[in-house]
């Protein structure tokens, strides 16, 4: 079989490309996905409050593990990635955060990326979005991605935690994706008006899958990209145990994510020559940056008992769950219709940072992100972590076998800045939690526990308990330097007919969750592939901190 375009990976980027490219009826597209369909009757992926469930199995999760992380007590750490139509948008936490404007302005200072400034990217964020309260200079109202804003009457702990952040001297913002990201405020989520997860399978593929020029093949595990010289001409994949090959007339578009995209390139002969030769993989093109520059967000949970019976603890008890499930199933409302990350914020921990370097997610229950280690009492917590770590990792293929997971090392916490930021984050969080807005609710500190105070004690807590935020990125970075893998249009350097379009091409990780930005990247490059003029540059105003102090005097100073 032959198609104009072959897309590898039906995730946050691949589904965007499949939908946009097939808007032209004379273009044929094959979309290959290693996982299965996004079963709409499976509450594990469709109910926002059930977000922990897909991470606990392997039906929707590749369930990668890192190599022993040398600065984290040699722990092998989780690296969950989505498997199935929707990719990681099928199993993520549904937080709709775009990053800070300064992230993109910083990208645009890099050679070859001049058109990736915030005002160049903002029109594509708007194009992708339908926000439930309508459009403005920052938000769209006609896009495929349903974005829900928090509503009146949601859990009172959200409001108390935001107010505590403001009382601690930090800014308030009414829109973390609007004029000013810096500060504490409500958090948008990718949830439909009917209370369902708004994955890219639902938002994009639902409108495209009936087109005659789009072919979707699930349970299709990519083996390698096929080349004639330096030109990509097709893909070899397995449908179950059966090997298949397909040809691409125009381009192969690799959208397999920050772990699998470099793995597939390397297995296909595009990557660091020494690595490939050591595995007896024929070298098609020596490209040393493939799999390098790997970045992620690391986070911790600071947990508190709640003196008032207002947390979500009762929802964790099995005898309350049938009622919650029924309300969600038949009405699309209630606890089940929210991911329960409805407030958070971004702050600068020190004046040396020009834009926020710490992110908060507030949660009105005390539990790990993957659903483990729930505290058996009313509680609440802050997820807190640094945003732009200087630590760099790598992804390396282990063999020619498409079924073997790659070697992954994030090299977490490898710089002194990492340790300083995380110590600061714990101490700042404790100061926030001590503010009067939380006096009514705040019980004892469950984790880390008040006995953990010195730098050495904090460091050991971090080494033992910090976890991934599931934001791998930057492993096929765009740019023009010697370690860049693609140019500003996603085209692989030194190759023809081959692009990478996903979170792996970010040159530096953004300040926030990755899904919204990955969708934006795909929307922007889709116009390039179609040889369309870019959308007109936005003229929206946006906040730059300049010489503004990190914070005002707190209402209640640290004791």
Curated annotation (Swiss-Prot):
Protein's pathway: Amine and polyamine biosynthesis; betaine biosynthesis via choline pathway; betaine aldehyde from choline (cytochrome c reductase route): step 1/1
Cofactors required: FAD
Catalytic activity: choline + A = betaine aldehyde + AH2; betaine aldehyde + NAD(+) + H2O = glycine betaine + NADH + 2 H(+)
Region (Disordered): 182-201
Keywords carried by this UniProt record: FAD, Flavoprotein, NAD, Oxidoreductase
Active site residues per record: 471 (proton acceptor)
Binding positions (FAD): 4-33
InterPro entries: BetA, FAD/NAD-bd_sf, GMC_OxRdtase, GMC_OxRdtase_N, GMC_OxRtase_C
SUPFAM superfamilies given in the database record: FAD-linked reductases, C-terminal domain, FAD/NAD(P)-binding domain
Top-level taxon of origin: Bacteria
Any Gene Ontology biological process: glycine betaine biosynthetic process from choline
Gene3D superfamilies: FAD/NAD(P)-binding domain (3.50.50.60), Glucose Oxidase, domain 3 (3.30.560.10)
GO CC, any one term: membrane
UniProt GO molecular function: betaine-aldehyde dehydrogenase (NAD+) activity; choline dehydrogenase activity; flavin adenine dinucleotide binding
Keyword NAD on entry: yes
EC number(s) from the headed UniProt entry: 1.1.99.1, 1.2.1.8
Keyword Oxidoreductase listed: yes
Family: Belongs to the GMC oxidoreductase family.
PANTHER family in the record: CHOLINE DEHYDROGENASE, MITOCHONDRIAL (PTHR11552:SF147), GLUCOSE-METHANOL-CHOLINE GMC OXIDOREDUCTASE (PTHR11552)
HAMAP family: Choline_dehydrogen
Function: Involved in the biosynthesis of the osmoprotectant glycine betaine. Catalyzes the oxidation of choline to betaine aldehyde and betaine aldehyde to glycine betaine at the same rate.
Name by which UniProt lists this protein: Oxygen-dependent choline dehydrogenase
Protein source organism: Pectobacterium carotovorum subsp. carotovorum (strain PC1)
Gene that this polypeptide is encoded by: betA
């Amino acid at each position: 079989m032959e198609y104009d375009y072959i897309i590898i990976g039906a995730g946050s980027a691949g589904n965007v490309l499949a939908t946009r490219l097939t808007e032209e009826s004379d273009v044929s597209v094959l979309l290959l996905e290693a996982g299965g369909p996004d079963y709409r009757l499976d509450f594990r992926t469709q109910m926002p409050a059930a977000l922990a469930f897909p991470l606990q199995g392997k039906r929707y999760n590749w369930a990668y593990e890192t190599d022993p992380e040398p600065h984290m007590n040699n722990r092998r750490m989780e690296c969950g990635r989505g498997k199935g139509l929707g990719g990681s948008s099928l199993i993520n936490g549904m937080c709709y955060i775009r990053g800070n404007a300064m992230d993109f302005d910083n990208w645009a200072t890099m050679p070859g990326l001049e058109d990736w400034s915030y005002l160049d990217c903002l029109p594509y964020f708007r194009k992708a979005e339908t926000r439930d309260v309508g459009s403005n200079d920052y938000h769209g109202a006609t896009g495929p991605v349903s974005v829900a804003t928090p509503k009146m009457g949601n859990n009172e702990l959200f409001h108390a935690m935001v107010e505590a952040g403001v009382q601690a001297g930090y800014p308030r913002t009414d829109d973390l994706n609007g004029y000013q990201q810096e500060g504490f405020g409500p958090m948008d989520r990718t949830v439909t008006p009917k209370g369902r997860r708004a994955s890219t399978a639902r938002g994009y593929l639902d409108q495209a899958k009936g087109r005659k020029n789009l072919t979707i093949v699930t349970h299709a595990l990519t083996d390698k990209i096929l080349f004639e010289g330096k030109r990509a001409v097709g893909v070899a994949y397995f449908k179950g145990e059966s090997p298949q090959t397909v040809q691409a007339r125009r381009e192969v578009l690799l959208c397999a994510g920050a772990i699998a995209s470099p793995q597939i390139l390397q297995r296909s002969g595009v990557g660091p020559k020494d690595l490939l030769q050591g595995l007896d993989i024929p070298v098609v093109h020596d490209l040393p940056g493939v799999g390098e520059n790997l970045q992620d967000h690391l986070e911790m949970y600071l947990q508190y008992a709640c003196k008032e019976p207002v947390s979500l603890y009762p929802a964790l008890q099995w005898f309350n769950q049938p009622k919650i499930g029924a309300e969600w199933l038949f009405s699309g409302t209630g606890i089940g219709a929210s991911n329960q990350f409805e407030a958070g914020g971004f702050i600068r921990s020190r004046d040396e940072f020009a834009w926020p370097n710490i992110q908060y997610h507030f949660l009105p229950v005390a539990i790990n992100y993957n659903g483990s280690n729930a505290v058996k009492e009313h509680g609440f917590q802050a997820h807190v972590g640094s945003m732009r770590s200087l630590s760099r990792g790598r992804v390396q293929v282990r063999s020619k076998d498409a079924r073997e997971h790659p070697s992954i090392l994030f090299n977490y916490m490898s710089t002194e800045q990492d340790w300083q930021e995380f110590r600061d984050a714990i101490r700042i969080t404790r100061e926030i939690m001590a503010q009067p807005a939380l006096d009514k609710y705040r019980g004892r500190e469950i984790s880390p526990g008040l006995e953990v105070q010195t730098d050495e004690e904090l460091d050991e807590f971090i080494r033992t308990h910090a976890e991934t935020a599931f934001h791998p990125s930057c492993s096929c970075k765009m740019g023009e330097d010697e370690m860049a893998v693609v140019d500003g249009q996603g085209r692989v350097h030194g190759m023809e007919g081959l692009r990478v379009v996903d979170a792996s091409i970010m040159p530096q990780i953004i300040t926030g969750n990755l899904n919204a930005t990955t969708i934006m990247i795909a929307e922007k490059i889709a116009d390039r592939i179609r040889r369309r003029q870019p959308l007109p540059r936005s003229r929206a105003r946006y906040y730059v901190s300049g010489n503004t102090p990190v914070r005002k005097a707190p209402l209640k100073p640290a004791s």
